[in-house]
């Protein structure tokens, strides 16, 4: 239950064995390859070493194409996803089968061609519909659209704004070109669609006269035939385009049997990408390849066994303290504390060489969650949901941590529900009373702690728990400072407050007073005065003392007061649950009927679903705040870099690895 010890790895291997070695390191999954900056920083090394080039761009393109193809299958051949389904297991040989991978890329290429055809058909349809809509205002015109002129006349189609009076426009036209005629074909809210016939020699005067009213010529591209004929042709073409598009979509859907293979290949491409990126962190010459990285110390024997198969030289060493900021961090915990990795990862990993907070945080986090939720019914729901998810889905990593944490918090919620007598609020007494009975139901009617009546006791208990957790954090910090040789800081920074708190307790209990003077408390105050000003000079000692007293007292008061949220959320959840139970039972106040029972069930289910959802999230957020701000603030040193080894990390399948 600690931060895993890391070893610094330096390795050289003959070039011809590079790919095979990277494959074995990936299967081993315990080596993180570092950036080559340190190797290339030395001028002599940089002169003979060159950075390796992986096919990152190519593999990333393959991953993008596979992902897009899977999305197309989900679009054109959707399937109902099973909520509680586990990931299929594949053998290492099947997962790393290059032949099958290339076959699926060929299938992806065919899907891409079909999708390109679908997009092309969509464009053709959009263009045809646009042309068809442009022709609709002219569909009552019997003249061919390409009839632009006769021997002596010019025929033009155009538009005038709807606000223009056509009679006035025709009069203006007659004044400018007496032999011209203007005919209205159709009108809508925006424009008049008109036909202009004029002598060729009067065309300029006619157009000029109409443009004063906003006239514009229609651009119908000289389509042959009438507008109605062109519309009918467009409709036929659209029908043909739709048919071809639907056929292309059907052809895409026919690749549905490849869905699982695509998922496997997406995982394969993701792993290939990680390997290619790792390869680009290598440097070498024409004959050898060099790398630097980090190894989890417990896996040293496994790595040694793997490297023994290769023509290579390697060196393992412990990192120096100066290198600690660069050392990646991996947390190793037992089954009880492992789920808290999710919480730690959400905040920030601890710095290498410090303390893993999970074993310290786990009992407090789980207990506090149970205090805030405190309902047997809700706890049962959480435990059942977690067990079903773990059994059916067999989740990995983050999802597994979440389910395990949900189960642990469910147990805590159930146990604290026994203390408060909550089972979906006061559901059982409410139902019993609804049927006209008034009986004692043990803890359900006479709980050890009633959130509505024992609020003060619960508040005091919450603050006591807060004091215990904060004191735990200070003890941890004292131990860390002592290990670093900062014994004085441990005594005067943290030890002082323990003496003060002990003195306050003894003073209240009237123990250890000499002549009415609280000796232990006075010693604590003197330690605070000396400790806060021991590094200051002159008048700075005075301000340092006042600052230490003010910041210390207000800081402790504020931190402990934050734990009052334990009582507040317990009270809120209990009250809301009881309110919904009361509302659900009201229709049955005059007697239970079928209708009143249906109303009860509906209100009960909806109300508790809402209350459960709000509390499930709210309790997690507030619990997280107590850990990350109050508790971690007493000892935690963050800033750790996550350990990212070269490994098989998949999303859709689980790979059976029997080699290591």
Model-flagged regions — what are they?
Residues 1-361, 389, 396-399, 403:
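Long, charged N-terminal accessory/stalk domains
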Residues 2-7, 16-22, 26-33, 300-660:
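Conserved, carboxylate-rich catalytic/transport cores that coordinate ions
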């Amino acid at each position: 239950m600690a931060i895993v010890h890391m070893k610094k790895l330096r390795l050289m291997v003959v070039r011809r064995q590079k790919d095979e070695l990277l494959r074995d390191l990936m299967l081993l999954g315990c080596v993180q390859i570092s950036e080559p900056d340190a190797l290339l920083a030395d001028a002599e090394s940089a002169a003979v070493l060159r950075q390796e080039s992986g096919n990152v761009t190519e593999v990333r393109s393959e991953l993008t194409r596979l992902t897009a193809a899977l999305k197309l299958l989900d679009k054109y051949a959707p399937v109902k996803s099973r909520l509680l389904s586990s990931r299929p297991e594949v053998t290492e040989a099947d997962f790393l089968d290059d032949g099958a991978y290339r076959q699926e890329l060929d299938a992806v290429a065919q899907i891409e061609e079909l999708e390109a055809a679908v997009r092309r058909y969509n464009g053709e349809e959009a263009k045809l519909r646009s042309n068809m809509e442009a022709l609709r205002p002219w569909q009552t015109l019997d003249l061919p659209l390409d009839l632009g002129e006769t021997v002596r006349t010019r025929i033009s189609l155009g538009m005038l704004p709807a606000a223009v009076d056509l009679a006035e426009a025709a009069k203006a036209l007659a004044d400018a070109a007496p032999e011209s005629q203007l005919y209205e074909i159709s009108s809508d809210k925006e424009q008049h669609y008109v036909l202009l016939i004029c002598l060729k020699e009067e065309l300029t005067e006619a157009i000029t006269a109409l443009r004063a009213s906003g006239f514009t010529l229609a651009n119908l591209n000289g389509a042959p035939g009438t507008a109605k004929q062109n519309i009918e042709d467009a409709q036929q073409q659209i029908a043909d385009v739709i048919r071809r598009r639907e056929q292309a979509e059907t052809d895409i859907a026919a690749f549905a049997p490849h869905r699982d293979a695509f998922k496997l290949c997406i995982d394969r491409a993701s792993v290939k990408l990680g390997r290619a990126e790792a390869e680009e962190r290598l440097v070498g010459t024409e004959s050898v390849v060099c790398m630097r990285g980090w190894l989890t110390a417990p896996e040293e024997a496994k790595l040694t066994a793997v490297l023994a198969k290769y023509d290579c030289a390697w060196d393992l060493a412990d990192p120096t303290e100066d290198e600690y900021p660069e050392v990646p961090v991996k947390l190793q915990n037992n089954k009880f504390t492992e789920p808290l990795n999710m919480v730690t990862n959400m905040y920030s990993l601890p710095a290498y060489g410090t303390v893993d907070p999970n074993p310290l945080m786990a009992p407090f986090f789980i207990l506090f969650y149970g205090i805030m939720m405190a309902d047997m019914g809700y706890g049962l729901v959480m435990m059942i949901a977690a067990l079903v998810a773990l059994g059916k889905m067999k989740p990995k990593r983050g999802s597994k941590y979440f389910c395990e944490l949900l189960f642990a918090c469910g147990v805590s919620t159930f146990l604290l529900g026994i203390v408060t007598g909550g089972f979906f609020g006061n559901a059982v007494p409410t139902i019993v009373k609804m049927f006209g009975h008034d009986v004692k139901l043990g803890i359900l009617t006479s709980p050890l702690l009633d959130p509505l009546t024992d609020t003060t006791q619960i508040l005091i208990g919450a603050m006591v728990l807060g004091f215990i957790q904060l004191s735990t954090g200070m003890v941890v910090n004292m131990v860390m400072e002592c290990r670093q040789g900062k014994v004085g800081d441990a005594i005067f920074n943290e030890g002082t407050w323990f003496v003060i708190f002990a003195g306050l307790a003894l003073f209240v209990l009237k123990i250890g007073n000499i002549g009415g003077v609280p000796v232990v408390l006075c010693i604590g105050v003197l330690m605070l005065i000396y400790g806060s000003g021991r590094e200051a000079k002159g008048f700075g000692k005075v301000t340092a003392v006042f600052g230490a007293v003010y910041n210390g007292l207000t800081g402790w008061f504020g931190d402990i007061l934050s734990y009052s949220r334990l009582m507040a959320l317990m009270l809120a959840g209990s009250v809301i649950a009881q309110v919904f139970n009361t509302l659900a039972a009201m229709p049955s106040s005059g007697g239970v009927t079928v209708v009143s029972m249906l109303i009860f069930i509906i209100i009960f289910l909806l109300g508790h679903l809402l209350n459960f959802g709000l509390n499930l999230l709210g309790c997690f957020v507030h619990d997280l705040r107590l850990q990350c701000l109050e508790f971690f603030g007493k000892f935690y040193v963050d800033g750790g870099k996550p350990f990212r080894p070269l490994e098989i990390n998949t999303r859709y399948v689980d790979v059976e690895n029997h080699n290591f």
